[in-house]
Design a protein with these regions (language model features):
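Exposed low-complexity, polar/acidic, P/S/T/G-rich flexible segments that act as propeptides
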Residues: 164-215
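Coil residues (strongly favoring Ser/Thr
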Residues: 58, 109-110, 186, 202, ...
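Long, contiguous, structured domain-core segments that constitute the functional module of a protein
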Residues: 204-344
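Conserved small/polar residues in nucleotide/adenosyl-binding loops
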Residues: 350-353
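Beta-strand-rich interaction/scaffold domains
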Residues: 56-131, 284-332
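Aromatic- and glycine-enriched pocket-lining scaffold segments that form the walls
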Residues: 112-185
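A short beta-strand-loop element at or near the start of a globular domain
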Residues: 1-54, 62, 118, 131-144, ...
Length: 353
């Protein structure tokens, strides 16, 4: 993940020295001081990886590490799954590690079954890391804080470094910066007393939340067993669909033969069917058959994804399984006439793709 989209949920303004609270709570917050050793705030920083679902074994022990990026990703550049994360972080920039399972058994069944429950993997930055980032945040100009945030914090790299057989489908990454402050009168600024203990000032939690959104770059690194992939590619009896990284499956359409047979006639309908072979793997957890398959002309494959285009029936055609398709044995593109006609326009060229 790189620079985050942001949403304000409070403010980071407080004096922490003399706040009298439970020591267990106070220990979770880091004092932030300026260059003159004066306290300018306090904070607790948590990072959450929310996921909508998962694949594989729900109880496989896994671990991830989160690193701070040392430079921003270029918003004008397209990043592919062969991106090298080491170009953007150092081992010393570790923010934290977390062991987890896809199903968190520390959460009660009654909570996990709620419609509002969303599972997550979270880490809390230690005192040293929270202090380093907190100093940047508290010294920032409050008026342009959100604009300045990407320059203060370039983003994170999440690395899976232990366990296999489980994939989390991350839907959102969130960083919460929480602090404790006195509750004051909005007009006079005088500290308000606690309703529980009138001898103590009232305190509250406040903070800001920074979310990853679709508008910012979320680049994924995928690596494959090259020898195993090559064996699949070398198979002459069938091919595999393995995307977005793995096997670049190509289909050749007889456009020249179609053009020769037409001889000026109009092409009304073209149907393409690609047979599906049954999976014979005996693995306990196997990925389900793809329900959506994109057929795209080779010449457009880079621009299609880099420009975030949608299937238009001309440069590409999308197969989507419907509820009426009970037994999926073939990917059927019922009408790719527009795509073929677009190819026919270039039939005079020496090579078609």
């Amino acid at each position: 993940e790189n620079e985050a989209g942001t949403k304000a949920t409070g403010s980071l303004v407080t004096s922490f020295d003399n706040i009298e609270i439970d020591s267990k709570i106070k220990d979770r917050f880091t004092l932030i001081k300026d260059e003159n050793n004066h306290v300018i705030g306090n904070c607790q920083i948590n990072i959450y990886l929310w996921y909508s679902s998962y694949f594989g074994d729900s109880l496989t022990a896994c671990r991830l590490s989160i690193y701070e990026l040392n430079k921003r990703l270029n918003e004008e550049e397209a990043y592919y799954t062969n991106i090298n994360p080491e170009d953007y972080y150092k081992q010393s920039d570790l923010l934290g590690t977390k062991a987890y399972t896809a199903v968190d058994l520390s959460v009660s069944d009654s909570i996990r079954k709620l419609d509002t429950y969303v599972p997550s993997v979270s880490i809390r930055l230690d005192q040293a890391k929270a202090k380093k980032l907190g100093q940047k945040l508290f010294k920032a100009d409050r008026k342009d804080f959100y604009k300045a945030f990407p320059d203060l914090f370039s983003g994170i790299y999440v690395k899976s470094d232990y366990g296999d057989g489980t994939v989390l489908y991350i839907s959102q990454v969130q960083m919460d910066v929480v602090s404790i402050e006195y509750v004051t009168d909005s007009i006079t600024g005088i500290k308000l007393k606690s309703k529980v203990n009138a001898e103590k000032d009232s305190i509250q939690y406040t903070g800001r939340t920074f979310n990853s959104t679709r508008e910012i770059i979320q680049a994924n690194r995928l690596a494959n067993d090259t020898e195993a992939i090559q064996k699949c590619i070398d198979n002459s009896d069938w091919t595999y669909l393995k995307s977005p990284a793995g096997i670049f499956t190509q289909v050749t359409l007889p456009v020249r033969q179609i053009a020769e047979k037409l001889e000026g006639d109009t092409l009304n309908a073209v149907k393409l069917g690609i047979p599906i072979y049954n999976e014979t793997s005996d693995k306990k957890f196997g990925m389900s058959m793809p329900r959506n398959v994109l057929l795209i002309r080779k010449k457009y494959k880079e621009s299609f994804f880099e420009n975030n285009q949608l299937s238009d029936g001309v440069t590409s055609s999308l197969f989507t399984q419907t509820s009426s398709t009970t037994n999926l044995t073939e990917y059927t593109y019922n009408n790719i006439t527009k795509l073929i006609n677009d190819c026919l326009k270039a039939v005079s060229y020496t090579h078609l793709t």
